[in-house]
Amino acid sequence: MTNGILQIARAAGEAVLATEGVHSLGTGRYAEAATYEGTEKFTGVVVKPDELEIHIVANYPLARSIPDLARLIRERVAAESGGRRTLVVVEDIEVANESL
């Protein structure tokens, strides 16, 4: 049995959110970044036939460089991607709220 694209998006999203340095999933800058199936959608992950597009907001200060964070995300979602190439889009940086 194969997973539906919404299941793939959700599983990938959970793996991404469990990654140190990821604040949240992004929504897309100029077009909505989401996967649709039936009447449901999952925002932050776009499942295409040959590609998985992950949109994130990273934490600042950074625990690792952006390229290292993207590599770690690709490793974490590899099992969920169904062999698709994974593209990581860093949409924004969320600065930690520090008390003065």
Write out the residue ranges for each language-model feature.
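Alpha-helical assembly-interface signal, strongest on the long, hydrophobic N-terminal helix that forms
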Residues: 4-12
